[in-house]
Amino acid sequence: MAGQSEDPSLERHFKGHRDTVTAVDFNANTKQLASGSMDSCLMVWNMKTQMRAYRFVGHKDAILSVDFSPSGHLIASASRDKTVRLWVPSVKGESTAFKAHTGTVRSVSFSGDGQSLVTASDDKTIKVWTVHRQKFLFSLNQHINWVRCAKFSPDGRLIVSASDDKTIKLWDKTSRECIQSFCEHGGFVNFVDFHPSGTCIAAAATDNTVKVWDIRMNKLIQHYQVHSGVVNSLSFHPSGNYLITASNDSTLKVLDLLEGRLLYTLHGHQGPVTCVKFSREGDFFASGGSDEQVMVWKTNFDAGSYPDLLKYRQNDTFPSGGDYTSIVQPADVHQPARNAHVTQAADLEPHITEMSVKDRSSPLSYTSRSVDQHHPQAEDGNLQTVASTLEHIVGQLDILTRTVGILEQRLSLTEDKLKECIEQQQATVPPSHSGTKKSSF
């Protein structure tokens, strides 16, 4: 039986969204967590306790996808308002938006090198963009229904997409051709992603299943029927040995891909779980749901064998559970009681600073102070509020100074023109005579 110390546990419980949480993602150093919601807001949560959260306001409709850039300097968000926004997660709240599609944008994702974006939309297309200046590169157009999700492969050579046409398509980025279609799902495919090795893909579907394909052999190698509701999202552990899934049945499931079995069922959300994501190192994962909550869990279960998992990654192999692996709840694995870990978690409602959007026509600067880079003496909420207010005042004073300078220049020009007019007038008027000529008789 697994020891208690190896069970995943709920570490944080963030409250602040006003509607269903639709997407979550950690930055590279796991110091921040971004979440998007049907409330149209992007939240950035600081993992360090007692630090404020930030609400970024700019989208005009629901946010359906968020993704941190590999460097952590940018966050991309996709919205029902048909736009994609790039945010600098700083106290300035800078953002740039571009109209990406003619329909709802369901998905946005950075490439591994952080230079490209891929978006998926209800307009049935997938589009690829440069991050710098958001230049459109090309579109992929073979789906015949809404495209729910699109992701780059780890090496950036391939793109995988999932659609309501019940297909998953694999695309070659260079040739821009569809090189494989998988049509084995009984329902719509909500989410798809690459295994960290790039050799497999996993998909979550409305028929309550999770399927894993080997894209080298174009073969279904694992088939999980462990949820009793629609599967909304999934995430691979960076080791490649575990897969976590989120479902409308209110649970998260941890799957052991090496052994082809269900490892844990996690309860915590009060309603459908809509999104889940491992941190870059795999030591945490976050989930969001229709209960408007963001939960951060400590992984724990990979601690004892992590070196072996990394070795597995290096060998670039992937476990096959046969043609189909039917999964049942194992009797020898500790199953935490419903909400057992929730009471142990920090139930946080941090002070939230709302950042109204400041759209930029020029490229975003990455040098702004990040929202997690506070000095110790500024971590107190009141001091941060004062600092933010002072920064705003300084900005306004700078604007006033520039305005006064412009007015002084205009006044000086006016004075010069007036002086010139007076001089010209004096030069054209003949001198007048003061005396009058007397007539003689």
UniProtKB/Swiss-Prot annotation:
Subcellular location(s) per record: Cytoplasm, Cytoskeleton
Annotated keywords: Coiled coil, Cytoplasm, Cytoskeleton, Repeat, WD repeat
Feature: compositional bias, Basic and acidic residues: 348-361
Coiled coil: 400-427
Annotated spans, Disordered: 347-376
UniProt repeat feature WD, residue ranges: 16-55, 58-97, 100-139, 142-181, 184-223, 226-265, 268-307
InterPro entries named in the record: G-protein_beta_WD-40_rep (IPR020472), WD40/YVTN_repeat-like_dom_sf (IPR015943), WD40_repeat_CS (IPR019775), WD40_repeat_dom_sf (IPR036322), WD40_rpt (IPR001680), WDR55_POC1 (IPR050505)
Gene Ontology terms: cellular component: centriole; ciliary basal body; cytoplasm
A single GO BP: cilium assembly
Free-text function comment from the UniProt entry: May play an important role in centriole assembly and/or stability and ciliogenesis.
Family, per entry: Belongs to the WD repeat POC1 family.
Protein name, UniProt field: POC1 centriolar protein homolog A
Source organism: Xenopus laevis
Originating gene: poc1a
